[in-house]
Amino acid sequence: MSSKEQKTPNEQVSEEMENTAEQQVEATQETGECVDPRVAELEVQLSDALQRERESLLRAKAEVENIRRRTELDVEKAHKFALERFSSELLPVIDNLERALDTADKTNTELISMIEGVELTLKSLLDAVGKFGIEVVGETHVPFNPEVHQAMTMLESADHEPNHVMMVMQKGYTLNGRLLRPAMVAVSKAKS
């Protein structure tokens, strides 16, 4: 028998009880005799017990299905966020490469090849982490979102709408939609 054709002990007992009850009802109907009140009472009890067992079996099946679904979700989350700690350790490396590029003297011809090397290294690192679901949070001129931004200061600005990101002090990152680090930003406010 295949695994789907095999029956659990509860299913076997339920089927046996059902078959017995059906046989008794058929025998009674065929004979057409007046049934002893005790037999009728036992048939009712048997029918009630059979119904309770069916309901119990359905509840058990539903519980097993719920456990299976929860386990699948837990495994999926574990796969999705297994890189979270490792990714958090890479963020300072990305920050340091960006700072090195910001402070490098781009007018010095002797440093141009080194600067290009750092730029390529940073680009390849960002491409590599991007393949695993890490995304940068660092846009300006977007509405302030406390779920991904950390406001460091508020500045008056005529160029920006109120409550919008004016400047990013440190980029934030998400891993598959989950925040690794909020972006540290300056938020605009209306001129008073």
Curated annotation (Swiss-Prot):
<dbReference type="InterPro" id="IPR009012">
    <property type="entry name" value="GrpE_head"/>
</dbReference>
<comment type="subunit">
    <text>Homodimer.</text>
</comment>
<feature type="compositionally biased region" description="Polar residues">
    <location>
        <begin position="20"/>
        <end position="31"/>
    </location>
</feature>
<dbReference type="InterPro" id="IPR000740">
    <property type="entry name" value="GrpE"/>
</dbReference>
<dbReference type="GO" id="GO:0005829">
    <property type="term" value="C:cytosol"/>
</dbReference>
<dbReference type="Pfam" id="PF01025">
    <property type="entry name" value="GrpE"/>
</dbReference>
<protein>
    <recommendedName>
        <fullName>Protein GrpE</fullName>
    </recommendedName>
</protein>
<keyword id="KW-0143">Chaperone</keyword>
<keyword id="KW-0963">Cytoplasm</keyword>
<comment type="similarity">
    <text>Belongs to the GrpE family.</text>
</comment>
<dbReference type="GO" id="GO:0006457">
    <property type="term" value="P:protein folding"/>
</dbReference>
<dbReference type="GO" id="GO:0051082">
    <property type="term" value="F:unfolded protein binding"/>
</dbReference>
<dbReference type="GO" id="GO:0051087">
    <property type="term" value="F:protein-folding chaperone binding"/>
</dbReference>
<dbReference type="GO" id="GO:0000774">
    <property type="term" value="F:adenyl-nucleotide exchange factor activity"/>
</dbReference>
<dbReference type="GO" id="GO:0042803">
    <property type="term" value="F:protein homodimerization activity"/>
</dbReference>
<keyword id="KW-0346">Stress response</keyword>
<comment type="function">
    <text>Participates actively in the response to hyperosmotic and heat shock by preventing the aggregation of stress-denatured proteins, in association with DnaK and GrpE. It is the nucleotide exchange factor for DnaK and may function as a thermosensor. Unfolded proteins bind initially to DnaJ; upon interaction with the DnaJ-bound protein, DnaK hydrolyzes its bound ATP, resulting in the formation of a stable complex. GrpE releases ADP from DnaK; ATP binding to DnaK triggers the release of the substrate protein, thus completing the reaction cycle.</text>
</comment>
<feature type="region of interest" description="Disordered">
    <location>
        <begin position="1"/>
        <end position="34"/>
    </location>
</feature>
<dbReference type="InterPro" id="IPR013805">
    <property type="entry name" value="GrpE_coiled_coil"/>
</dbReference>
